[in-house]
């Protein structure tokens, strides 16, 4: 079980409600999560909420959020919250993974204190007694503005301000913020609480944002509380977005409703769609403290004298045109094939400078992509029309400070993966930054993130590409490998443990996600092992690269004994041991490998099966033996040749001697015969 412990000042709570009979889940040895007691008012669009009891301090009223595995928690917020000295923010107590008996799988949970009162609205469809201006200032704005100042000091955004995530204390009526940890910034927000440019994006690509985005959400919250209801309940997000683009956010959200005369100019100033026209925290604080209103004066927008028509829709402004072009990308590509759009901007919008910029979207520049495509050109034109809007490229829409979460969206939706890669390679982020009328506080950080993503995407090998972006840029995301089958790994040692469990059944888990997770989360570099795996020409080389990778990860991140993984790799790499020529060395290595199996250290196995020194010694001595064998063979052959030659010479000499002896004997016989006759 893995967890990160966070300190929290303990707040006494009333008795917990009665628990139902489902089996409780024990987290971190003390937190008893009650799956049978659901807390719907604390749940979010990506997480479930359950009553939780602290075994050591049962008087504390807690709850557990069970997270969506595919939506990363805000690790920076989880770690930073404990250092924010403000009681208007609920702070996490503990988070990590837990075995969840209800589902038979592992889950990620965050333990939090329950809010000290009810939500301002139980849902965005609910109604309530409208708040007076005095209540809004005293109970809502004063504590929340002070909280935002403290968070800004820690460079942390809230991005979760809305009536359903704000709670009113039962003892003094002051407002407390709910959690901000379960999902990326802005992910849980209804689109109406987001500025237009972020509302255009899917929740996961809305971006980190800054204080200006918080003030917009405060403005919408003031409107809802001032009316006592959501003025656009039942209106779809797309319809509301279209209204906001054409009418402005304030008019589109308020509609025919009326706000208190003292509140209306404040809300209007907070809901300006141009960020530089929106009230700052200082402006809002001045109104709260003095009551004086200095409403911002928006610059009049440029509206065409005749509309641009596209697919049955009309646009009178540059932003409207940018928006409708994204509704049919292929049709929009045909529109930019000639100068029709450019001429409309020049003549109908009377904006020659922008028309010139559109004409320059095609040529390659020093900071542009290596190759210009029609898709990149169209994306540039859309950004030129609406520079403060999100980047729009084919089917992908994102704010530049959401490159990290966008990688998850791309990796889980293969049709979007190519969009993400081409968007980064096309240097759309650079172009977007160039077109900003005013710098953003987060632009430098976003640029650094984009550079990281580009470096990983340039390598398509295992452990790189889109999967590497996913884990490098989202540090709280668990490994998304489908092969884990219900296991959750937030840290490398947890993934090693999961692999060890699966290895007990003879299954070796390894895929692009697992490789990228290890590469991103392990202290030290494993790029060499990953490249060796990619370049492997056979299964043995691939297995050795895998073994070296896992051994490195185990040595850096885990004290776990991996006997099952050790056994699997030893079986797979047995042919490598058998390939040693020296029988004594081969037997010695096999003996060492079996002896080390009890420790389950993969590094020990690496030293045995991938020992370059011993392999060279074996090869060198084999070559020496081979040369000696060749020399001895030559000597034997020579001796054999000399023996045959001597045998032939001996036979020849024997024949000669035999002939000579025969001659002598013949002479002697004749002599004896002659002498016998004479005598």
Give the role of each language-model region.
Residues 223-258:
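Conserved C-lobe activation region of Hanks-type protein kinase-like domains
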Residues 258-273:
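Conserved C-terminal C-lobe helix
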Residues 140, 148-170, 177:
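Catalytic-loop of the protein kinase fold
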Residues 91-134:
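Conserved structural core of kinase catalytic domains
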Residues 131-145, 149:
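Conserved short alpha-helix within the protein kinase catalytic core
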Residues 19-91:
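ATP-binding glycine-rich loop module of kinase domains
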